[in-house]
From Swiss-Prot:
Region Disordered, annotated ranges: 25-46
Induction details: Transcriptionally regulated by SigD. Negatively regulated by TnrA under nitrogen-limited conditions.
Source organism: Bacillus subtilis (strain 168)
Listed name of the protein: Uncharacterized protein YxkC
InterPro entries: DUF4352 (IPR029051), Immunoprotect_excell_Ig-like (IPR029050)
Chief location bin: secreted
Domain of life assignment: Bacteria
Signal sequence extent: 1-30
Keyword Nuclease carried by entry: no
Biased composition (Low complexity): 29-39
Places the protein is found: Secreted
Keywords associated with the record: Secreted, Signal
């Protein structure tokens, strides 16, 4: 009986270790750093309002604002103490001849001057979509050829760091847009 218990405990520990190795174990807001300065030097940076064409998409960041709250009187998200919410609106158009799977639509990260990237705040993003009347669910669907959709994201970051630093949006298709 004792051998079975020890075997069971070891199996659970091995599963946890394997899960952490596969999943990366990350739950923090700052998810990664840029690994190579030479890569950063070769990446072209665009500005708010520029339409950037890639092989499959056209991406345009249309609006960026930092706020203390996002949402409406019924659904509101306030920034944490010492934080600010960076709210972003953008469009993505499929310029290819085939539908783009929802899993292949570019994701968006906020990146500071040190290369640390930040994930969006889900609650703040939903509340900002409600406030701006943007149907964010369209970003979650397959995108057919010549169709353009609007998306919104909201990121919560340190207010002081945001006020002082240079910030960019990085799309997973390597489009980088300087926002501050």
């Amino acid at each position: 009986m004792r051998h079975k218990i020890i075997t069971f405990i070891l199996a659970v520990v091995v599963i946890i270790i394997i899960g952490n190795m596969i999943g990366g174990g990350g739950g923090s807001e700052a998810t990664s750093k840029t690994s190579s300065s030479s890569k950063a030097e070769t990446e072209k940076t665009y500005n708010i309002g520029d339409t950037v064409k890639t092989e499959k998409t056209e991406v345009t960041v249309t609006k960026v604002e930092d706020r203390d709250t996002v949402g409406t009187q019924y659904v509101e998200k306030k920034a944490s103490e010492g934080g600010t919410i960076v709210a972003v609106q953008y469009t993505i158009k499929n310029v290819s001849k085939k539908p783009i799977s929802s899993f292949s639509i570019p994701t968006v990260k906020l990146v500071d001057a040190d290369g640390t990237s930040y994930d969006s705040d889900i609650d703040a993003s939903v509340n900002y979509a409600t406030e701006t009347k943007v149907d964010n669910s369209k970003i979650l669907s397959d995108l057919n050829p010549n169709i353009k959709v609007t998306g919104v994201k909201a990121f919560e970051v340190d207010k002081e760091a945001y006020a002082k630093g240079t910030w960019k949006l990085k799309f997973s298709n390597d489009v980088i847009v300087k926002i501050k």
